[in-house]
Amino acid sequence: MYATQALLPTLTTELAVSPSTAALTVSAATGALALCVVPASILSEKYGRGRVLVISALGATTLGLALPLAQTAGQLIALRAAQGALIAGTPAVAMTWLSEELDPRDLPGAMGLYIAGNSIGGLSGRLIPAGLLEVTSWRWAMFGSALVAFTLAALAAWALP
């Protein structure tokens, strides 16, 4: 979700855009997520929480693998908006699903783990591409970050009930 934040100075140079245009790679994803959380929640009522969660996580991370192929800033921003829309199903479903499936006594600890995991994901989503950028291009940094995210999403999809 935040991989491009670590790459903003490089994106500005490599894509020959202003810093504010490069920043749209972050804003487009977070804005689309915000707009799509409620619709994703409604979809989870109709099609099932697990299905929406898996489609959301695998869809967003699969799209992340394609991000390095963007040739222009406009393409990258559009793909990031689509990625944000796809990932909206994850927060829309996760907390509700936990509250439905767990004993109320176990819920606070589970919610704490969810929030901690979300924070770790946000941090690693910045650190992984930043570290990779030290030894490779922004495209490979994005791909490496997306590959880690896809692997974890696939593992989660496999482990979910």
Where do the PLM segments sit?
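Conserved MFS/SLC helix-loop-helix module at the cytosolic interface between two early adjacent transmembrane helices
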Residues: 35-71
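Extracytoplasmic
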Residues: 1-19, 37
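Paired small-residue
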Residues: 63, 74-83
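Juxtamembrane helix-start elements in MFS-like secondary transporters
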Residues: 18-22, 26
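Membrane-interface helix termini in secondary transporters
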Residues: 10, 41-42, 131
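Cytoplasmic helix-loop-helix junction between adjacent transmembrane helices
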Residues: 79-118
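Residue-level signature of mid-helix packing/kink "hotspots" within the transmembrane helices
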Residues: 2, 30-38, 122-123
